[in-house]
């Protein structure tokens, strides 16, 4: 009898957001905006959340659109890492 292993690839969460601060060394603050449908009023409610992400080469600047991915905790507040800069600020 053969045993088949059911292996699942656990995907890491990833977000696209706008850099709001790059003042810290190797750290950026990314604001991620989401829209959700309100159950009772059937209107879209927008909300935003800020994440601190690790930027190894200090490549991102304020206003850039970036993609961040979940990572093991790097410090008390940082558990996200910059993967790519999608669009530079004008």
Swiss-Prot record:
Annotated Pfam families: Ribosomal_S17 (PF00366)
SUPFAM superfamilies referenced in this protein's UniProt entry, alphabetically: Nucleic acid-binding proteins
Keywords, ordered alphabetically: Ribonucleoprotein, Ribosomal protein, RNA-binding, rRNA-binding
UniProt cross-references to PROSITE patterns, sorted A to Z: RIBOSOMAL_S17
CC per GO annotation: cytosolic small ribosomal subunit
Alphabetized GO MF terms: rRNA binding; structural constituent of ribosome
Any single GO BP term: translation
Lineage: superkingdom: Bacteria
UniProt similarity note: Belongs to the universal ribosomal protein uS17 family.
Role according to the record: One of the primary rRNA binding proteins, it binds specifically to the 5'-end of 16S ribosomal RNA.
Assembly mode: Part of the 30S ribosomal subunit.
Protein name: Small ribosomal subunit protein uS17
Gene from which the chain derives: rpsQ
């Amino acid at each position: 009898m053969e045993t088949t292993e059911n292996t699942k690839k656990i995907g890491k969460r990833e977000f696209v957001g706008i850099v709001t601060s790059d003042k810290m060394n190797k750290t950026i603050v990314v604001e991620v905006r989401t829209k959700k449908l309100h159950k009772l009023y059937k209107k879209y409610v927008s909300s935003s959340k800020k994440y601190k992400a690790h930027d190894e080469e200090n490549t991102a600047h304020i206003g850039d659109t970036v993609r961040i991915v979940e990572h093991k905790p790097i410090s008390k507040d940082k558990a996200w890492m910059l993967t790519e800069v999608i669009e530079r600020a004008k």
